[in-house]
Amino acid sequence: MWMKIQRVKTVIYSVSLLVAASSLPIANAAEKLQTTLRVGTYFRAGHVPDGMVLAQGWVTYHGSHSGFRVWSDEQKAGNTPTVLLLSGQQDPRHHIQVRLEGEGWQPDTVSGRGAILRTAADNASFSVVVDGNQEVPADTWTLDFKACALAQEDT
């Protein structure tokens, strides 16, 4: 059972010399899911290597839970649940393929969407990284994902 779904949307800018950095904190109350996404600075158009970190995310929930899930409904690429295909805002033919990853995170093979982390810890972090070596044109990229805390499983 899923609970406390929170949606996070941010923009990744790729231009010849500059990429904007942003931080997007959402929610504050003790029993509410909190999500934060920080986009890295100075991402250049051109060659980007596999594994390059584009953003770092955090999910926090202080209530009873058995883990976290992060996914995107709109940007899923292919059959790998953790891989997303971002389209450029200036030119929708521009693409960059990214993946969600982090220590302990696994592809959610049950639903086929996103990454899941089984933990009772209140906090978890994940990264958005480049998936494969790519040549990326200058454009603006929107990263749109959802996060939730997983309900305690009945034993």
Regions found by a protein language model. Name each.
Residues 10, 38, 109, 119-122, ...:
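Generic alpha-helix detector with strongest preference for long hydrophobic helices that associate
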Residues 73-119:
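Mid-chain, structured segments of secreted extracytoplasmic proteins
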Residues 26-90, 123-136, 140-142, 146-155:
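N-terminal small/polar-rich segments of proteins
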Residues 2-14:
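Bacterial N-terminal signal peptides that target proteins for export
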Residues 20, 24-25:
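N-terminal signal peptide c-region/cleavage motif recognized by signal peptidases
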Residues 14, 43, 62, 95-96, ...:
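Compositionally biased, intrinsically disordered low-complexity regions enriched in proline and serine
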